[in-house]
């Protein structure tokens, strides 16, 4: 009897009261098992609803305070179920999916008090879409509305709050250190591409206070890139860089895809736009040991690169550059114009 008691105590210490084992998933580590090259309007709408609901649940449900669930793999399970189904069936699947994470407590009074405070940001996220019963149906809408008031005191594994010093004070900043990077996926399938879109769009939707300043309505970005990522000739890095540039923010920079888009090599010149013309602004930086005369001088104007006018390259590069004003766009464009995919002498 003593041996049995000791064994039971040992087991209870390994699995404390209230602890739930992590959910077991299929192996999605390299493939989402969901791929498309074309999507029609009905599938696009289903995926847009899924992306919104998935992101809202991700940042509002208390079940994600620990590592019991993997939201990336949850998405991969949902994609084949939702993509081609009728709206009513889609909504039922998503409502049942939310129910599967279990019960939770709400803290409505606490949140209402915060929202009534004068310190709340004027342009906070508009989540009125969760009450759209015409699109979501009554049951799914009710679950999302209740989820808004869920008690999230335990935190969220996918986002935490960190602080950085600015103007002699500490300012809060979201830190997405709970996301898996998937470094080995250089050419991900459509499911993983959608994961990129859904992750990024929802990060901006809930944590980027300047999204109302972008040139393009942020609500239009989600369906656009759901469609773009499905295109068979669309480069993943190319579309990711284009999507990030939609923020029109100098801080939104992504190094991936620079070589693929603009070339690995660069003409050794520093240039800038002066009155709309591409001008050499510092001397030629070719090493002295080349023993040749520098082909460019300060003040020279570059009118074409490889027989194509500068205006052509401006049009090609502009959509991949994230800057908040025209001067910064031109400065970044000047650098990219002189890149090339071939290594050859001037």
Question: How does the language model describe each region?
Answer:
Residues 20-346:
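Flexible, low-complexity junctional segments that flank or bridge functional domains
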